[in-house]
């Protein structure tokens, strides 16, 4: 594995063709994101089937992340686009209307989430078109909210709206989201990204839907609201992973605060052994150009050095002019950055449980032995995640008896979820099967040294309590 930091790429019109998806995998994609803010179930199923077929042909494990759109707040339909000027009046009507100009320097619109208008107060701000236009609330009555525009900008139909100063209380999971979740369950996606999470309750609601359908899927909370930043500790505890979604976050909080918030969230996720994705506008210029800016390359590099498990491409791969090139640039940036990576963080974290002590010891011992790889025999994937937390400068190869578990590790830093073995209650048989499969697939050489972690009794989550050093003699024994 050339790189340890993983790449998530969004599938869209620019990347949906089989030959492009194939090249993106070859260039370094580990996880594909299906963005349910756009497209039909049939569209996403077609892309999902293509990804899985191509990954199988390439003998590569690729994870699937379903990004649930959530209650995105948008402008209603406009009769025609507005060219708003500083000082113009813009009224937000409580009823559904067709947005239009009603007088000189005076416009009216409606929004799709009307209950939010009841939560606004005088002097609060509304940001339109994903933050490009700012409006200040100056008057509120039973019919409308009156605002004054504070900067010039164009406004179109169905554009995003943010309320950074307003405490908003709306359901994070809409009926559309519930239908999309059922699609994800049916099609066995590996990760769910939940939009506009504000607290742990929002994660618990999704987990309850999964439980009602007798399934488990790793839930990633998208941090893009100010409330989420305030409640980050409880969100990390409740979720399986975190996505730092810097687009909306940079509207909800002053954008110059985003870098420090990103670093803090990554550190907290690392502390909790929860995978974290850094997302949005990482190589944004590649949506329209073949080359990235130096600042964008530095942005990717800094996210890697911060300790992110994965970096994500959005528009760059969904609608960009050359998605495979975007993946290649990101991959090369990661590889170069990891030459100066602060590996071996054995003393950076507190032990959360006894498994942490075992995994820290195994990562440390493997480094001291100059082992060629760590093999993690795992039922749930947690032991491999915990080893990765310490960032050893050697490959972590996950061995499991569940495709679902191995797929869930496709997003975790430094973990190669490569070896699928049969489930066994006999530890010796499990070790033999693991060593044989690893040698046959070319991940283990009989003349090298490895470290292996496992749990006894076998097949039980949370029982990692065993470390084995595998040298030539031990490998030969298990190959008998």
Where are the language model's segments positioned?
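Non-catalytic helical/linker scaffolds that mediate oligomerization, partner binding
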Residues: 1-480
